[in-house]
């Protein structure tokens, strides 16, 4: 064969490999996107990474990074399509075409900011040149560690974890009570990596280990679901979903409509026997404690009906900054405790690179004051006892709810306003609520401005859920529970453990004995 023909065959083979790599990345990213709500084909989580992992065994590092990033970009673009629901922003004074550009830019930017983490993971997995169980341990520890680190700090956006896609799988999700969402994520990555090793090496032992691991997850879930729920003090919880359009909510007429809607909802729930009422995030879009409170008509209703309320509005500090706050009002309409939103939405409520992009971001928000974040040590005392609270983005972070439950909270409440976004966001947010309920072994009650509002029991089962973009006011029985899950006691113990196992696999693979033993693993 001539040199030209040989070179041509090599080029054709390389082209085929390149196409195969792109297909593996796009296919894996698409599978992850379909696994997430609202499609909710969660079973795909257990195999979605297999094509990419198989392909990466023979791929060099720079290309591995771009293929991993491509897989992540496809995944997050599907997952975060609800960001396009920002458009149109004409009610904020932004023209139609610039509004569309802002929505598209936000969608692509946030997707890319998450996708590169998968690219880095793929690159490092390839760079280590590990194989067998060492590769599996390293892949698991690295995935868990990188995503945990990226979930820290002001710009953290821990949305779209593999556990979130498995939240609707009642057998699988029980695992999070043992080690939180990160444990379930690690198990899913381990199954993917073991299947990929089996495929690449043609050794059925790895597939057997993967099947054993997955079976253990589901057997534990089956056993847990067969147990009766613990007894606890019963509580009739009322929820109001006002369904006030975002474009109208911030106008003078809209504020009057808001007050009328929530006063009516409160009256309905009090008449239906509610013992505690929850409103959505900023249900009352103004400073609650100012002397001329626009929500004054609600106060005599509370004093007459004597049903306490967890009411969300703004709270202002002496320095002029405001917080998104839950006010615990007793039967006399007195504020007995408050909870300020802990995790502010990046590029919305808190602004990285403030000097550079601050003016633009403020133009996109109806709240013009500086927003301050609450502390992790907050405790919301209510007339029914200590309650673990979260507001909007807080439910993406397990640490706040866990800390409050460890301090004695017997119920979780989540107050949110998802009216900014498209309909795909609501089921994803609801999946986070299910994770938080199972992690802590508590009922979770969620109130959303436009849906969905829901009640989730300690096993992740939804006992009540509303529609999207509808008004709703309902009463649902829950129980105030005590006792601690392993996760509530120990937190994210799996994160350092997986990091240690990854390091162990890396060290073993680098040692002379480890290099000699690669053929046997």
UniProtKB/Swiss-Prot annotation:
Residues 240-480 form the CN hydrolase domain. Keywords: Acyltransferase, Cell inner membrane, Cell membrane, Membrane, Transferase, Transmembrane, Transmembrane helix. PROSITE patterns: CN_HYDROLASE. InterPro entries: Apolipo_AcylTrfase, C-N_Hydrolase, C-N_Hydrolase_sf, LNT_N. Pathway: Protein modification; lipoprotein biosynthesis (N-acyl transfer). Catalyzes the phospholipid dependent N-acylation of the N-terminal cysteine of apolipoprotein, the last step in lipoprotein maturation. Belongs to the CN hydrolase family. Apolipoprotein N-acyltransferase subfamily. This is Apolipoprotein N-acyltransferase. It comes from Gloeobacter violaceus (strain ATCC 29082 / PCC 7421).
């Amino acid at each position: 064969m001539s040199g030209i023909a040989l070179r041509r065959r090599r080029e054709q083979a390389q082209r085929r490999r390149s196409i195969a790599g792109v297909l593996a990345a796009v296919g894996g990213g698409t599978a992850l996107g379909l696994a997430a709500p609202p499609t909710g084909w969660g079973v795909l989580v257990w195999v979605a990474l297999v094509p990419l992992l198989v392909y990466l065994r023979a791929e060099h590092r720079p290309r591995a990074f771009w293929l991993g990033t491509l897989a992540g970009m496809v995944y997050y673009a599907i997952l975060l399509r609800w960001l396009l629901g920002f458009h149109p922003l004409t009610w904020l004074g932004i023209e139609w075409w610039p509004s569309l550009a802002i929505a598209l830019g936000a969608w692509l930017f946030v997707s890319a900011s998450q996708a590169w983490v998968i690219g880095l993971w793929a690159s490092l997995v390839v760079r280590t040149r590990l194989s067998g169980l060492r590769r599996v341990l390293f892949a698991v520890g690295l995935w868990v560690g990188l995503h945990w680190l990226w979930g820290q700090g002001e710009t953290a956006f821990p949305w779209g974890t593999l556990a979130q896609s498995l939240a609707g799988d009642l057998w699988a999700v029980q695992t999070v009570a043992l080690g939180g969402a990160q444990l379930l994520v690690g198990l899913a990555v381990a199954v993917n990596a073991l299947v990929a090793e089996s495929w690449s090496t043609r050794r059925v032992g790895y597939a057997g280990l993967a099947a054993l691991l997955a079976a253990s997850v589901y057997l534990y879930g089956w056993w847990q679901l067969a147990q009766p729920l613990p007894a606890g003090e019963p509580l009739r919880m009322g929820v109001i979903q006002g369904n006030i359009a975002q474009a109208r909510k911030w106008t003078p007429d809209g504020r009057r409509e808001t007050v009328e809607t929530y006063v009516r909802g409160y009256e309905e729930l009090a008449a239906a026997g509610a013992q505690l009422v929850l409103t959505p995030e900023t249900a009352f879009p103004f400073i609650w404690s100012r002397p001329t409170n626009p929500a004054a008509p609600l106060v005599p209703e509370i004093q007459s009906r004597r049903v306490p309320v967890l009411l969300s509005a703004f709270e202002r500090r002496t320095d002029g900054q405001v917080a998104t706050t839950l006010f615990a009002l007793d039967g006399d309409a007195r504020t007995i405790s408050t909870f300020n939103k802990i995790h502010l939405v990046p590029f919305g409520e808190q602004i990285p690179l403030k000097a550079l992009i601050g003016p633009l971001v403020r133009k996109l928000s109806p709240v013009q004051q500086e927003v301050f974040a609450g502390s992790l040590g907050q405790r919301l005392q209510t007339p029914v006892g200590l309650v673990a609270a979260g507001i909007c983005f807080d439910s993406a972070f397990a640490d706040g709810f866990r800390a409050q439950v460890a301090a004695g909270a017997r119920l979780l409440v989540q107050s949110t306003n998802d009216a900014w976004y498209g309909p795909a966001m609501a089921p994803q947010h609801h999946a986070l609520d299910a994770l938080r309920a199972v992690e802590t072994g508590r009922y979770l009650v969620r109130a959303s401005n436009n849906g969905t509002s829901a009640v989730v029991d300690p096993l992740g089962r939804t006992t009540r859920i509303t529609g999207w973009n509808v008004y709703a006011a309902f009463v649902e029985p829950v129980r105030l529970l005590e006792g601690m899950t392993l996760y509530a006691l120990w937190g994210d113990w799996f994160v350092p453990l997986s990091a240690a196992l990854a390091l162990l696999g890396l060290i073993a693979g680098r040692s002379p004995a480890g290099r000699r033993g690669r053929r046997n693993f």
